[in-house]
């Protein structure tokens, strides 16, 4: 329902601009995802922690959800590993909120750990992106949301990003690998056309 309803609301809006809340404790990674989203014509708000994200969304216990209608956040992209409130914990809190649970949440991580990926998907994540996030990833996410979850590349069956990624996971051998931290900061490779979900499968086979 979330992606389809979001697509309808954006299509009916006079200014169908996607507003993305990006959460990452790394300043460099925040700038990278902000740049990619802006290149893709998205409005971006960045915060440096899960706690700040909750405050912005009105889930910190002080503001309630009174400001949600003014925020109009269409997508939340968060790092998995952060001090304090992790991306996984942030995901759970968002999905437990009746006011926010329909907002798609995408998890990012430099670690390709299948149990972690599966755990996030079970809790309601729309997709799990392997860092460094590429422009192709952002464009694909935006396209999926604007189409209401319809898969790209001539697919006739509508699938959510969650299911698309799960297909990639199911077809790859079980493994755990870690990308170097420096790779997530490689700005020169932002235009790589290989989406993260495909890189997860390829690295699992490596």
UniProtKB/Swiss-Prot annotation:
Q: Give the induction text.
A: By cytokinin (BA) in roots.
Q: Which residues carry this modification: 4-aspartylphosphate?
A: 79
UniProt cross-references to InterPro entries, sorted A to Z: ARR-like, CheY-like_superfamily, Sig_transdc_resp-reg_receiver
A cellular component term from Gene Ontology for this protein is: nucleus
Residue ranges, annotated region (Disordered): 151-206
Q: How is it modified after translation?
A: Two-component system major event consists of a His-to-Asp phosphorelay between a sensor histidine kinase (HK) and a response regulator (RR). In plants, the His-to-Asp phosphorelay involves an additional intermediate named Histidine-containing phosphotransfer protein (HPt). This multistep phosphorelay consists of a His-Asp-His-Asp sequential transfer of a phosphate group between first a His and an Asp of the HK protein, followed by the transfer to a conserved His of the HPt protein and finally the transfer to an Asp in the receiver domain of the RR protein.
Q: Which GO terms describe its biological process?
A: cytokinin-activated signaling pathway; regulation of DNA-templated transcription; response to cytokinin
| Keyword Transcription appears in the UniProt entry | yes
**Pfam families referenced in this protein's UniProt entry, alphabetically:** Response_reg
Gene3D superfamilies on file: 3.40.50.2300
SUPFAM superfamilies, alphabetized: CheY-like
Domain (Response regulatory) spans 19-146
Biased composition, class Low complexity, residue ranges: 168-187
Where would you find this protein in the cell?
Answer: Nucleus
**Transmembrane residue ranges:** none
GO molecular function terms attached to this record: phosphorelay response regulator activity
> What PANTHER family does UniProt report for this protein, alphabetically?
TWO-COMPONENT RESPONSE REGULATOR, TWO-COMPONENT RESPONSE REGULATOR ARR15
Give the family this protein belongs to, as stated in its UniProt record.
Belongs to the ARR family. Type-A subfamily.
| Record function comment | Functions as a response regulator involved in His-to-Asp phosphorelay signal transduction system. Phosphorylation of the Asp residue in the receiver domain activates the ability of the protein to promote the transcription of target genes. Type-A response regulators seem to act as negative regulators of the cytokinin signaling.
Q: What is this protein called?
A: Two-component response regulator ARR15
Q: Which organism is it from?
A: Arabidopsis thaliana (Mouse-ear cress)
